[in-house]
């Protein structure tokens, strides 16, 4: 069986490397995706990636994917998007939620997630390494 993971990055993550590097780090999204692509390839897993600032594009990608696992950093949509939640529940694909920063150590409005209670797991506060942790967990589950 061919294993596939869909990596979803939400709004403003295209600015990684220059947006608040003290919070989000110095790596660009392209750097992170390249690293994850290598990790996936080494494990014999296909990695599909989308980043968008538009909620509907992320929803369409969720609806269209044939991946068996999703890793999502919904960014600001974490706290606002019932639509993303419904899309994830609608396709019934297990997912991990990732955040670069520790959202629980930040402003109170960032403490609530519309996705966390449905995620396999939530990884936050480890910077770009959080994606690596999520992908390793996804690969382990896919190959179990």
UniProtKB/Swiss-Prot annotation:
GO:BP terms for this protein?
A: amino acid biosynthetic process; aromatic amino acid family biosynthetic process; chorismate biosynthetic process; quinate catabolic process
Q: Site (Transition state stabilizer): give the residues.
A: 19
Q: Per the UniProt record, which EC number(s) apply here? A: 4.2.1.10
**InterPro entries noted in UniProt:** DHquinase_II, DHquinase_II_CS, DHquinase_II_sf
Subunit organization: Homododecamer.
Per the record, the gene is aroQ
- Active-site residues, as the UniProt record annotates them: 24 (proton acceptor), 99 (proton donor)
Coiled-coil residue windows = none
* Reactions the enzyme catalyzes: 3-dehydroquinate = 3-dehydroshikimate + H2O
Which cysteine pairs make disulfide bonds? none
Query: What is the protein's given name?
Result: 3-dehydroquinate dehydratase
In terms of NCBIfam families, this protein maps to:
aroQ (TIGR01088), PRK05395.1-1 (NF003804), PRK05395.1-2 (NF003805), PRK05395.1-3 (NF003806), PRK05395.1-4 (NF003807)
The residues that hold substrate are: 73, 79, 86, 100-101, 110
Function of this protein?
A: Catalyzes a trans-dehydration via an enolate intermediate.
Pathway terms, separated by semicolons = Metabolic intermediate biosynthesis; chorismate biosynthesis; chorismate from D-erythrose 4-phosphate and phosphoenolpyruvate: step 3/7
Which Pfam families does this UniProt record tie to the protein?
Answer: DHquinase_II
